[in-house]
């Protein structure tokens, strides 16, 4: 009783000890998150940085390809072998990087469930609720632990990749700048969109598990909602634009229909990912940050931010 009375005296009573203990509890997820972070953007840019000097030297040696000396010929063959090996590593890293990003999305969901386990795991409710802390400490401590375990390593990985990008001489790959545009699109709009996508995933998952009460529902509902929201949103847009309700707003061209689907960017993490990939492929990654990443446009970014904040606020008031 005395401990509970002490907890009520402060808004964030014993926040730091509770937060550190929760991060320690989530140590397996933290280790996997760090591994996924290292294998994604930084590893990709590290291989690119190693490959750039090789491409530059091959470009310089190509000037003497018509009449090379024996030393130049041997150097050219050695560089070709090295480039072949590096390209094999790059392809393998792209596959591993994509799998790591998928794993990060999955572990973001798992970490949120484990951090807020008292909402769906009845076997630990009494133990968690008996701790001498108040509801604010419990909610924000759990949420801060999720951000530390999943979002912080992701953000640091993006920053490291941005630093490595500054040292990469991508002009040696092609004269049209296509490689440079693709790499900048991946390291810029796509990377930060993935970061915001994970934050929105945490918000939606937390809102749904706050009133589920069972582990099965807590696992199934966030996944179903993540798919259902963009599908229902897109179907509603198509129904309105096709004249079902008495008005034809746009022509029925496929390109127009796809272009009008951009609002699903703000509806869910899946919608954000779909429209980001579509934007990058439709312009060949050649464009501004807002062209490659719809989330950076105010008309989509602000609603996405409001939806995310609303989910966090709803979860807070439901849990508290």
Name each model feature, range by range.
Residues 1-120, 311-320:
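Hydrophobic alpha-helical transmembrane segments
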Residues 30-46, 149-155, 222-241:
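Hydrophobic alpha-helical membrane-insertion segments
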Residues 66-84, 272-295:
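Juxtamembrane membrane-water interface segments that cap and precede transmembrane helices
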Residues 86-90, 94-97, 144-218, 230-233, ...:
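Secretory targeting signals
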Residues 106-109, 185-190, 296-300:
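Short alpha-helical transmembrane interface motifs in multi-pass membrane proteins
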Residues 115-151:
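Helix-loop-helix units of permease transmembrane domains in multi-pass membrane transporters
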Residues 218-267:
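Aromatic-rich transmembrane-lumenal/periplasmic boundary elements in polytopic membrane proteins
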Residues 279-320:
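Alpha-helical transmembrane segments of multi-pass membrane transporters/translocases
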């Amino acid at each position: 009783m005395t401990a509970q009375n002490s907890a009520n005296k402060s808004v964030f009573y014993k926040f730091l000890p509770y937060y550190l203990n929760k991060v320690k509890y989530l140590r397996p997820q933290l280790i996997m998150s760090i591994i996924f972070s290292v294998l994604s953007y930084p590893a990709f840019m590290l291989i690119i940085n190693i490959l750039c000097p090789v491409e530059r030297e091959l470009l310089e040696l190509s000037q003497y390809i018509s009449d090379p000396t024996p030393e130049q010929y041997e150097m050219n063959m050695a560089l070709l072998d090295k480039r072949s090996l590096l390209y094999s590593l790059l392809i393998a890293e792209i596959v591993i990087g994509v799998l790591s990003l998928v794993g990060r999305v999955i572990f973001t969901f798992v970490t949120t469930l484990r951090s807020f386990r008292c909402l769906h795991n009845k076997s630990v409710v009494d133990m968690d609720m008996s701790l001498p802390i108040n509801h604010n400490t419990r909610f924000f401590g759990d949420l801060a632990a999720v951000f530390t375990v999943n979002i912080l390593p992701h953000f640091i990985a993006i920053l490291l990749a941005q630093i490595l990008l500054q040292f990469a001489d991508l002009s040696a790959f092609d004269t049209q700048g296509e490689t440079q545009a693709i790499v900048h699109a991946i390291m810029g709009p796509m990377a930060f969109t993935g970061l915001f996508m994970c934050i929105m995933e945490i918000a939606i998952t937390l809102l749904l598990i706050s009133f589920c009460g069972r582990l099965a529902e807590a696992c199934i509902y966030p996944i179903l909602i993540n798919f259902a929201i963009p599908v229902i949103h897109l179907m509603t847009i198509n129904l309105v634009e096709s004249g079902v309700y008495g008005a034809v707003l746009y022509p029925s061209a496929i390109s127009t229909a796809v272009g009008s689907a951009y609002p699903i960017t703000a509806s869910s993490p899946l919608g954000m990912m779909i429209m980001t990939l579509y934007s990058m492929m439709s312009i060949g990654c050649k464009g501004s940050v807002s062209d490659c990443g719809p989330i950076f446009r105010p008309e989509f970014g602000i609603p996405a931010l409001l939806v995310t904040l609303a989910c966090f606020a709803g979860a807070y008031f439901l849990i508290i």
